[in-house]
């Protein structure tokens, strides 16, 4: 079915999927404003611009959306979630439309960085399983940015699998598998695509390993970074800084559940108990 929008001089025809996409972006913008108003992201007189974070050697310069500890999210009944997770979620922390809007800007920042470095190609390394949705949407944004600018920046994708949690407990030593032939990374610009950085142990281990493979550069783009105590000092290019709560959805999981949620949500005690498994790994 097609819907026509009539202007004074022309007729613009959009498919329903295009209309839904426009509405999704508009909703994301409105929700972004609500988050800003509720969480006091902007300078409140107590900090000097908390959105701008110091850059480490493995960081691509980008602003960070900070969701404060005082922000209590959005009621789940206002969003589409699976009946399987009824009573398992505390609230929606980041709606999907807001995620998509943030990734558009991250994509432009990343292309800016590699253009400035005169990079001839990028190898994106997705950290599975939680990073696959972030990767798909990020690559889509990168490709749109490259096309719009009329530049040549070939991209390839590799995958590495990491296990770092059992239930809500970070295990003592993250397990990395699937890196493949080490020679494939020699003299490559590697962009690690991670879903969330918590303690920083997993990403630090992965960067150290990649550095040993004679890569040209190793950078990290993470959808989320969690405010932990003691504070995790590793600062990648990041979409959102979030409170130290266990988050699920948008491919982030709790024992391989909740990956199918459209939004990023905070799991509650009922959900943790319902989907818990016996813990055999040594905690941190």
Swiss-Prot record:
Enzyme class, UniProt record, top EC level: transferase
Subcellular location: Cytoplasm
Function summary: Converts guanine to guanosine monophosphate, and hypoxanthine to inosine monophosphate. Transfers the 5-phosphoribosyl group from 5-phosphoribosylpyrophosphate onto the purine. Plays a central role in the generation of purine nucleotides through the purine salvage pathway.
GO molecular function, one term: magnesium ion binding
Catalytic activity: IMP + diphosphate = hypoxanthine + 5-phospho-alpha-D-ribose 1-diphosphate; GMP + diphosphate = guanine + 5-phospho-alpha-D-ribose 1-diphosphate
EC number annotated for this UniProt entry: 2.4.2.8
Bound cofactor: record note: Binds 2 magnesium ions per subunit. The magnesium ions are essentially bound to the substrate and have few direct interactions with the protein.
Domain of life the protein comes from: Eukaryota
Binding residue positions for GMP: 129, 194-202, 226, 253
Pfam families with a match to the protein in the record: Pribosyltran
Protein name: Hypoxanthine-guanine phosphoribosyltransferase
Cofactor: Mg(2+)
Binding site for Mg(2+): 253
GO cellular component: cytosol
Subunit structure: Homotetramer.
Residue numbers annotated as active site: 198
